[in-house]
Amino acid sequence: LIFVILNKNLHVKKLLAAVCISVSALSFAQDYSVPAASPRQKVEQQFSMSKISIDYGRPGVKGRKIFGELVPYGQVWRAGANSSTKITFGQSVNFGGKTVPAGTYGLFIVPTEKEWKVILNKDFQQWGAYTYDPKQDVVDVTVPVNKLADKQEWFEITLNPTDENTGNLVIKWDMAQAEVPLKPSKLDTVIKISDKLKEIKKIESDSTKKS
């Protein structure tokens, strides 16, 4: 009888141990995920009187020939990896010389050896460029491609300000880099509003100091 009881107790202990291990494994799985081959990145930056945000996948070179092979020349590319790249403008902007209303767009590129056509498309919720429809294009601009001095291993999109109201959308990967100039669609109006806001803030600051 004692042997039976001990056996039962041992069985219960093993069962409890198995449950504890399962719970711990589940908790670990909830906190961690499998490393992504092409990590997703979100970039948000102040631009003029609002913000610009970009959501994109970052594939690596990994010893491959990129432009002209992995990314064929003359074909629409998702400008990243996995789901299409999304760019959101908080205000109407001048995108490489063309007006784009505030909103979210899919960002695509048609690369050639010497220049890239950078496209903003209404459909920003597709996988890759498999369902890309040129009829949904909002604007496209063609910009020159520059050769980098050092290889860019991971695909990267950045926003580089040139002053408080203008900047460049910089896209680079492997040995190639292209830039699209950005500014508010109504720069004169934005500057006037900005100057007026600065005047108001100065008056408020002076008033606070006097009191």
Language-model features and meaning:
Residues 1-32, 207:
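Bacterial Sec-dependent N-terminal signal peptides
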